[in-house]
Amino acid sequence: MNGTRNWCTLVDVHPESQTAGSVDILRLTLQSELTGDELEHIAQKAGRKTYAMMPGHSSGHSLASELVESHDGHEEIIKVYLKGRSGDKMTHEKNIDQLKSEVQYIQEARNCLQKLREDISSKLDRSPGDPLRQQEIQVVLEKPNGFSQSPMTLYSSPPEVDPSMSEDVESLKKTVQELLVKLREAERRHQSDRVAFEVTLSRYQREAEQSNVALQREEDRVEQKAAEIEELQRRLLGMEAEHQALLVKVREGEMALEELRIKNADCQTEREKSAALEKEVAGFREKIHHLDDMLKSQQRKVRQMIEQLQNSKAVIQSKDATIQELKEKIAYLEAENLEMHDRMEHLIEKQVSHGNFSTQARAKTENLGSVRISKPPSPKPMPLIRVVET
């Protein structure tokens, strides 16, 4: 930054053939009066530790760096080589974005200082005075950093400073400092709001994952119950077929017994055979009665399985509704976060462009903080269907 003596230019150089284990180059263009502590403070904003080796400032740290003089002689360029890891790529990109935003803010301050120089030049053009004095002030204003590097001046006597110009410069410095303080406060508030939204979003994501796990368990249980129901139905069909076969045998035995009674009423052998047939028929009847009991029991079990299956389906539908509701909440929070981010960017641009936003920023920030999240209406639960045995 050439507009003021307390700033620097940060450039992140990425070669086209950069690999995962290559070295990142961070170039800092400093004024000659910039100290090592100020350089370290600027480097810490980017998430890295930078040690500047300036003349007259000793440092005990060892870091690959290169000190280069600029072409015009007003600046010193320190190239600091930072070893980056492939796993920290996203963090590096985030730090680069922060550096770009800070450079943008510095550029805006530089534009303000350039505008102040133009205003002072226009005032000097309008006000009559000593042409040599105006020429000296014009030479000072046209310098890239706004001050002379050489200790010698144009005249042997110390120059007189215009009080109005000094007051304008002081007021501009105070305004820039106030703007930076308010901007940092807005960024801190935005960071806290973003952290709160991220915590809420992570909580909803955990709830959604838990709901998905519970839903998967319910689906597995329903599949198991369905397999058991199919097995019971298969057994039930087999018992019904056996029941029909036994009924046919009973009818045949009764018919044979009746024929024997008609044909051989007086024959003992026939009586014994008839008694044996009667015993067999009695045994068949007991088996039929037992099969009827088993059939009714299996039917009750099937009805209970069907009822449990329907209840499980109702639970699954309610879980699906809960998951959908959580997804809608997540989408709503993401939309609110994006909207708040856009509003903050618009507010920052508006505040920097106009320079008068103390009350408006506070009111808009309070309005942004009061975000209401409306819960979407939950779907009605499915009715519970119970099978009644008749």
Swiss-Prot record:
A GO CC term assigned to this protein in UniProt: cytoplasm
Gene Ontology BP, a term: biomineral tissue development
Keyword annotations: Biomineralization, Coiled coil, Secreted
Tissues and organs where the protein is expressed, per its UniProt entry: Ameloblasts, and also non-odontogenic tissues including kidney, lung, liver and testis.
InterPro entries on file: Tuftelin_GRINL1A/MYZAP/CCD68 (IPR051375)
GO molecular function: structural constituent of skin epidermis
Ranges in a coiled coil: 88-126, 163-352
Region (Disordered): 356-383
Record localization: Secreted
Superkingdom of origin organism: Eukaryota
Main location: secreted
Oligomeric and partner information: Interacts with TFIP11. May form oligomers.
Family: Belongs to the tuftelin family.
Function: Involved in the structural organization of the epidermis. Involved in the mineralization and structural organization of enamel.
The protein, known as: Tuftelin
Source species of the chain: Mus musculus (Mouse)
Gene designation: Tuft1
